[in-house]
Amino acid sequence: SVKLENARILITNDDGYSADGIEILTDIAKEFSDDVWVVAPEHEKSGASHALSFQNALNLKEQADKLYSIDGTPSDCIAIGISHVLKDKRPDLILSGINSGCNVGEDVTYSGTIAAAMEGLIRRIPSIAISQNYEAGKKNLISWDSSKHFLKGILTDITNVGWDSNVFMNINFPYCQSDKVKSIQITTQGNRDTDDLIINEVENNLF
């Protein structure tokens, strides 16, 4: 189990350090602890999966107190966050998100949000990936209501119980208002319909 009160929490995402989701997650984390740090990509890195920037030098920028950006991937952010930004004391917990869009089924293999939690797992730190689904085609109108309403309680419950050190947690919120959520379910990873995995050619040889 993880004691959230006064825990050292490292937060990242794949939507960028100024994205709405990571700001919401940071605010929720700060309800548990003052020792909350954000190290996140300077620009959106959705679909980066578990890539590490071996070929490029990375620029770490302090954007505000305990808020850093890196011109790299979410996994870069976890690696540098642990080894440099928080080198005096490792984080007790890693939170990755809140992602714009769900991370379920085979999509988890593409996700930078998921990969950041996996990087934390590799480094033997309890890690949780968090995603907020939205209605198809309405990413700009995403509602964070269910995340805001339920996440604090879910984090409290799962960290109190704890989980196997060889797994990370993956939380997904539906795109309905919180009063429409019927239950919270613990489940296993499923499969998606691959018929929509089509890459369209918009112009000649332009995809």
Could you describe each region identified by the protein language model?
Residues 15-23:
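Short acidic, Gly/Ser-rich segments with clustered Asp/Glu that frequently serve as metal-coordination loops
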Residues 121-143:
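Glycine-rich phosphate/pyrophosphate-binding loops
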Residues 3-9, 23-84, 88-90:
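A cross-family phosphate/adenosyl-ligand binding-site feature
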Residues 81-88, 115-126:
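Alpha-helix C-terminal capping segments
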Residues 102-111:
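Glycine/threonine-rich flexible loop motifs
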Residues 142-207:
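Electrostatically charged, flexible surface regions
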Residues 12, 39-41, 96-99, 129-131, ...:
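Short beta-strand segments
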Residues 15, 44, 73-74, 99-102, ...:
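Short glycine-rich anion-binding loops that position phosphate/pyrophosphate groups of nucleotides
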